[in-house]
Amino acid sequence: MTFDSFDIKSLIRPVIDFPKPGVIFRDITPLFQSPRALRLVADSFAQRYVEADFTHIGAMDARGFLIGSIIAYQLNKPLILFRKQGKLPADVLAEGYQTEYGEAFLEVHADSLCEGDSVLMFDDLIATGGTLIAAANLVRRMGAKIFEAAAIIDLPELGGSQRLEEMGIPTFCLTQFALTER
């Protein structure tokens, strides 16, 4: 299968000054409105990971749920949800982290993983890496390891992928944007 980064990038809408002035938000909803683009994204990830050796897929709240759940279904893997604070009903582990917009907490059910499990983590975008780093810390606290962190978009100028790599976590993104790219 051939992956055309230009086609995907053309369906990621830049929203200027959202959620605050000076930010160009990368809106992926047009990707999900195009059955062809969604299939291309899902199939690209599935093809990359179909023979990979990991036990679970971890999806980040909220846009990471969209692609993570599709890939978990396609690859027949258990799906672990990493949620924003206060959204999970049972016993949780929590981890604080910094985002490009401020401070937040990420939670996961404490019984989601066991020692020896290996997690492929999904989010829509890697910016500062804060969410995925918090998730990686939670995974490690449960005795599991991180197979890779994957996203549709990388913003390399914000250094998130580099931070993850420095923690020993490989990353994979389908496309990337410069901060000023429209």
UniProtKB/Swiss-Prot annotation:
A single BP term in Gene Ontology: adenine salvage
InterPro entries listed in its UniProt record: Ade_phspho_trans (IPR005764), Adenine_PRTase (IPR050120), PRibTrfase_dom (IPR000836), PRTase-like (IPR029057)
Documented EC number(s): 2.4.2.7
Gene Ontology CC annotation, any one: cytosol
A Pfam family hit: Pribosyltran
GO molecular function, one term: adenine phosphoribosyltransferase activity
UniProt catalytic activity: AMP + diphosphate = 5-phospho-alpha-D-ribose 1-diphosphate + adenine
Protein keywords: Cytoplasm, Glycosyltransferase, Purine salvage, Transferase
Domain of life: Bacteria
Primary location group: cytoplasm
Biochemical pathway: Purine metabolism; AMP biosynthesis via salvage pathway; AMP from adenine: step 1/1
Record-linked PANTHER family: ADENINE PHOSPHORIBOSYLTRANSFERASE (PTHR11776), PHOSPHORIBOSYLTRANSFERASE DOMAIN-CONTAINING PROTEIN (PTHR11776:SF7)
Function: Catalyzes a salvage reaction resulting in the formation of AMP, that is energically less costly than de novo synthesis.
Assembly description: Homodimer.
Family: Belongs to the purine/pyrimidine phosphoribosyltransferase family.
Protein name per its UniProtKB record: Adenine phosphoribosyltransferase
